Regions:
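Active-site neighborhood of divalent metal-dependent phosphoester/pyrophosphate hydrolases
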Residues: 1-9
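Active-site regions of metal-assisted phosphoester/phosphodiester hydrolases
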Residues: 8-10, 16-21, 25-204
């Protein structure tokens, strides 16, 4: 599970609370914004151990702080387990800002050394107003969108595809869609996206 702007404030550690409630014991959290009594930031929850964790600062100049949280895990697909790279991105509000942030991420050490067939899941609040970031920046380097372009904001009447899930390497997408339950519309001003993935077992 990947969360953006997850709070840790007023003595409530939501990352740990969600970890316990969902039975996902492995947690990585980086507070993009720190306050006197807490803050909020990117979070990855997993049933499997997380390693090789990197945080990349994507802040442009004096704009609001943004970042990427990346971790490596071993996921079971049937009788086999494979390494999967998980990347949680939160991009800025301005179009030029988002482009610069993606270029910085794609040129960064945690990412640029990965083989194209290495399974990668990249997801988050991309603030992608028009759904163009994938075709412009991610698909040229081998990513594909998990499922159709989906409107996720605002949650109660979605009109913008701000959020997205992209995959690269030996991964196949079975489905990717937002849950339609009322609680999903109440939990956040963005609808969540849920993807079901398989591994192409003929990979290295």
């Amino acid at each position: 599970l990947l969360f953006d702007e997850l709070p840790r404030s007023h003595f409530h550690d939501q990352a740990e609370m969600l970890s316990e409630a969902l039975g996902m014991r492995h947690v990585e959290y980086f507070p993009q914004h720190r306050f006197r009594q807490g803050g909020y930031g990117n979070c990855i929850l997993s049933r499997w151990p997380l390693s090789n964790v990197h945080h990349l600062d994507l802040t442009i100049g004096t704009r609001k702080k943004r970042g990427a949280l990346q971790a490596r895990t071993r996921v079971r697909f049937g009788q086999q387990s494979r390494t999967v790279i998980l990347t949680n991105l939160h991009l800025g509000l301005a179009g030029t800002e988002r482009g610069s942030q993606l270029e910085r991420f794609l040129g960064s050490d945690p990412f640029k050394g990965l083989h194209r067939r290495t399974p990668i899941v990249l997801a988050g609040d991309l603030n992608d107003l028009w759904g163009t970031l994938g075709p412009r920046f991610l698909m040229p380097v081998g990513f594909s969108r998990a499922g159709p372009l989906t409107r996720t904001f605002p949650a109660w009447v979605p009109i913008r595809p701000l959020d997205g899930i992209f995959v690269r390497g030996d991964l196949r997408v079975r489905r990717c869609e937002p849950p339609l339950e009322t609680v999903a519309k109440r939990a956040s001003d963005h609808l969540p996206l849920v993807a079901e993935l398989d591994h192409a077992m003929d990979g290295p």
